UniProtKB/Swiss-Prot annotation:
Top-level taxon of the source organism: Bacteria
Gene3D superfamilies (alphabetical): 3.40.50.1400
GO biological process: one example: heme biosynthetic process
UniProt: Fe cation binding residues: H222, E303
Compartmental location: Cytoplasm
Top-level EC class as recorded in UniProt: lyase
Protein name according to UniProt: Ferrochelatase
Gene it is expressed from: hemH
Family the UniProt entry places it in: Belongs to the ferrochelatase family.
UniProt source species: Brucella ovis (strain ATCC 25840 / 63/290 / NCTC 10512)
Amino acid sequence: MSGTDKVRVNVSQTAQTPLHTSAKLPKVGVLLVNLGTPDGTSYGPMRRYLAEFLSDRRVIEWSRLIWYPILYGIVLNTRPRRSGRLYDRIWNHENNESPLRTYTRAQGEKLAKALSDQPNVVVDWAMRYGQPSIESITDRLLQQGCERIVIFPLYPQYSATTTATVNDKFFEALMKKRFMPAIRTVPSYEAEPVYIDALARSVEKHLATLSFKPEVILTSYHGIPKSYSDKGDPYRQQCLETTRLLRERLGLGEDEMRATFQSRFGPEEWLQPYTDETVKELAKNGVKSVAVLNPGFVADCLETVDEIGNEAAEEFLENGGENFSHIPCLNDSEEGMKVIETLVRRELLGWV
């Protein structure tokens, strides 16, 4: 046999030997993240939560030289007790936690069950402020062998004060790690058909349970300072787009469904119209029946259950209104879980 023949045989034998004897899909983590919650309603837990939340530069953009004396000298000495009393009105005393934590846990558990056909996917959940922290759950996903992670900030409309700060905190946690997994972030979904359809179905189901027909339905979103929007934050436009699409889906006119903004804090002008002023104005102008939903919240929390369900209702009724109803958030309902699962499965394409 010639030298050339020997080379040909060796190449042929090598070509038939696979580079990998087995193909094992890497584990993929899916991390759901919502805004956060205190661990309790007493002064200590409330102060810790508010300190973390209100120290975030994405949330309060003022100079630290101006803001910190106000925060630590005034706000954190007065607001924890007031906020604690409000949280106590909606607290899940059976589980000793806020509704937001209850619903976010349920969303994580139901998503894990829905994705059980993907054995290499690990689902978990965290809070931007409070517990469980993004860093602790990121550690847990990495310890379970996740080489790829989909992070899902649970905000339908993007804002630097919400979506961006979740991503900031996630990457900050990874900065401490030697190994950096591959990352995908779920974008805002303010106009996704599955989301608009879920909102429409939730409205229709709720209205069917009422003994009255609302003359006006308000879509109330958490506000942000107007200056943030002026600097380029797309939040306002995305909120208005969600309301426009929902209005069209339900066949309502502009006077029958209106977008408003709630939860303003501090002396700055925030996005308008304000929800509390709008319900008061509607009542004084002779509107007798109103319903309010919160499309920007994927789970009920203090801002929806208490601020809308109690405070806005009281404002409306005290000024001449007769019927008020708060439409619950999507929470872990079938419609809400369909939204989350659809968006997660899209981001998992090519990874599972």
